[in-house]
Amino acid sequence: MSKGTPSMGKRNKKTHIACRRCGSISYHARHKVCSACGFGRTSKLRSYKWTTKRSKIPTH
């Protein structure tokens, strides 16, 4: 198995398709889970604190 430019030409299948819940191209066709909203894994919407930018805390 080689790495680099020759193996990049073998990437021709769609890993992610459009999600039914959020509409983004983040639904993994094989794993049946959306990486953007968490559809297929949980009924709750996927959200993490590290995805939003927090306001700066004054240091003085």
Swiss-Prot record:
Cofactor note: Binds 1 zinc ion per subunit.
Superkingdom in the source lineage: Archaea
Keyword annotations of the record: Metal-binding, Ribonucleoprotein, Ribosomal protein, RNA-binding, rRNA-binding, Zinc, Zinc-finger
Zn-finger region bounds: C4-type: 19-37
GO molecular function ontology, one term from the record: structural constituent of ribosome
Residue stretches in coiled coil: none
Names of required cofactors: Zn(2+)
Family of the protein in this entry: Belongs to the eukaryotic ribosomal protein eL37 family.
Function recorded in the entry: Binds to the 23S rRNA.
Protein name stated in the entry: Large ribosomal subunit protein eL37
Organism (species): Methanosphaerula palustris (strain ATCC BAA-1556 / DSM 19958 / E1-9c)
